[in-house]
Amino acid sequence: MADSLKMGNLSLNESQHAPAAPPSNGRAAYIPPHLRQRTMGANVDGAAAPPPPGPAAGAGAWNGPRNAPRGGNWANANASDFSPRAPNVPNGNNSWTPTEAQRRPFDPHAYGHPGHGGSYGGSQGGSAKGSGDGQWRDGKHIPGPANARLERELFGVPNDPTKQSTGINFANYDDIPVEASGHDVPEPVNAFTNPPLDDHLISNIKLARYQTPTPVQKYSIPIVMNGRDLMACAQTGSGKTGGFLFPILSQAFQTGPSAVPAQASGQFGYGRQRKAYPTSLILAPTRELVSQIFDEARKFAYRSWVRPCVVYGGADIGSQLRQIERGCDLLVATPGRLVDLIERGRISLVNIKYLVLDEADRMLDMGFEPQIRRIVEGEDMPNVNERQTLMFSATFPRDIQMLARDFLKDYVFLSVGRVGSTSENITQKVEYVEDHDKRSVLLDILHTHGTSGLTLIFVETKRMADALSDFLLNQRFPATAIHGDRTQRERERALEMFRSGRCPILVATAVAARGLDIPNVTHVINYDLPTDIDDYVHRIGRTGRAGNTGIATAFFNRGNRGVVRELIDLLKEAHQEVPSFLESIAREGSGYGGRGGRGGRGRGGNATRDMRRMGGNVGGGAPSFGGSYGAPSGSSYGGGAGGYGAPPAYGGGYGGGYGGGSYGNPSGPTGPSSWW
């Protein structure tokens, strides 16, 4: 065998326990790694073993003894004036030089304030380096620099077809009657000015090309800015989202962030905290609606210290948690996912100044009342006297107003127009069509109107949505579908294709019926009429928005006679033509009792009036409501002896079309079938 193998001047047949021996033709002795770097005895030639050679200058490797200081070149390790590196040797990849001990001073603003978020600086308003966001510094709001790319993404360009613009009848909104009840109601504003709004918010409103506040905004802005609670009812498409975002963001820009509670100070580490402390919370029933509100919040918080976040079920919770960790000042959430994050200890409500319930009646209809009560009353949210609470919706039936007593204090009731009514900008047509003829009539309508605008078709079941969209595709009509069984990614993709016009026909179930603001919808077709007239109102409200005109067509047959009387009233109120077959079916007597809408609540003559102004006690409620809850003369609530008696039938209000599982399990917000 060849002479003993040497590595790094270490002979593999050396031993720590015996004198070195001449090379042997036998097997080399194994030396454990932890013994190889010790000072060696004589080598095979009888000379002292030199120290192991160091790496080449700048190589960055470390081959020195284990107990020696780390460095690069160890060739002169025995010299009295040894230094790990010669002064003129350039640094290597990982090599250390004495000059590196002089570190740069820590900049607390480079990555946001420690423990207070990231790119937006979280609740303390620091700004991530190069993020272009604003800051709150020394008691002042410092807007960030403009970002042309982000402006195009948020606000679009003039005449952008994907952004809603005001239509030819927008000026007619000034003729809509407004009723504000409560004591000391502030005077409305007629323009976006300072005061009361912050200058930075006004600049963002101008970027969005909003020129005049809508009626609900004219009243809600001064009401909220004066610290009052609000219950606002307005027609769909009338600017309710801006009605609560404008005053909340304006106050935030003027007053700055809230301090994180002292007991949370031990949670910080490496400039980031795991628990978020938002100051504003907006709850909405569906994923699509919270995403839409979040997009609006991003617009009007542009270049500010406020960081909006959105959380909802059906999406990756990991990415949502990372978003929250980067800073969360304004949180838009569905109730189920918010309860989940509270249980995980990732969100605290202790700093909440503003609580907004959007589409509040729909959230209660969908079984969210336990989650909402837990969020509002069972967690660490400030009580009703220490926060402002705002309720916005297009309808507020009586029992919802009664529930508001627990959440609101000394509130102003704002009613814009006849709440729950339809816009006169929408031309409503009702066609008598039997079920087996619906497809052929639909094709006739689509051929007649073409695909110049966006057409939204509402059906009652998820199976029908898929079947009808497949049928339209087979007939060479570009169609897609959206319903509760589709994944979040599929739904977002379908909505994006519909908004952009690449797929101008969308078949939808009730998941898209309320709250969604889809620009340039010119035609809404109720392929299946809902069993609740309020759902009909919200479905056709997807067109005729912001003063634009639109067409709504409904397929009616005797299977829909339960809503015939309310449908006739709705058509008359909006000055629409009432077909003779509706009148004849109504005279048959089947339409005068009905279910009264929404499982017994019904619309009734006063469903949109402030209950505090009506004499009568509401089932032992607060004294300010006084009297009895019986129906006023001439109106029927649920058709039951003129009274309210029947409990809300949340499960049966949709004719069983959703099979009990369309909305998932309201009591299990994190279940796999949950779509909120």
Swiss-Prot record:
Keyword Cytoplasm: yes
Helicase ATP-binding domain sequence ranges: 221-414
GO molecular function: ATP binding; ATP hydrolysis activity; eukaryotic initiation factor 4G binding; G-quadruplex DNA binding; G-quadruplex RNA binding; mRNA binding; RNA helicase activity; RNA strand annealing activity
Enzyme class, broadest EC rank: hydrolase
Region named Disordered: 1-144, 587-610, 655-676
Catalytic activities: ATP + H2O = ADP + phosphate + H(+)
UniProt motif (DEAD box) ranges: 358-361
UniProt superkingdom: Eukaryota
Any one GO BP annotation for this protein: positive regulation of formation of translation preinitiation complex
UniProt keywords, alphabetically: ATP-binding, Cytoplasm, Helicase, Hydrolase, Initiation factor, Nucleotide-binding, Protein biosynthesis, RNA-binding
Enzyme Commission number, as recorded: 3.6.4.13
A Gene Ontology term for the protein's cellular component: cytoplasmic stress granule
Binding annotation for ATP: A234, Q235, T236, G237, S238, G239, K240, T241
Pfam family, one: DEAD
Compartments reported by the entry: Cytoplasm
UniProt feature, compositional bias: Low complexity: 56-69, 664-676
Main location: cytoplasm
UniProt key word Ligase: no
Protein family membership: Belongs to the DEAD box helicase family. DDX3/DED1 subfamily.
Domains (record comment): The Q motif is unique to and characteristic of the DEAD box family of RNA helicases and controls ATP binding and hydrolysis.
PANTHER family cross-referenced by the UniProt entry: ATP-DEPENDENT RNA HELICASE DBP3
Official protein name in the record: ATP-dependent RNA helicase ded1
Organism annotation: Neosartorya fischeri (strain ATCC 1020 / DSM 3700 / CBS 544.65 / FGSC A1164 / JCM 1740 / NRRL 181 / WB 181)
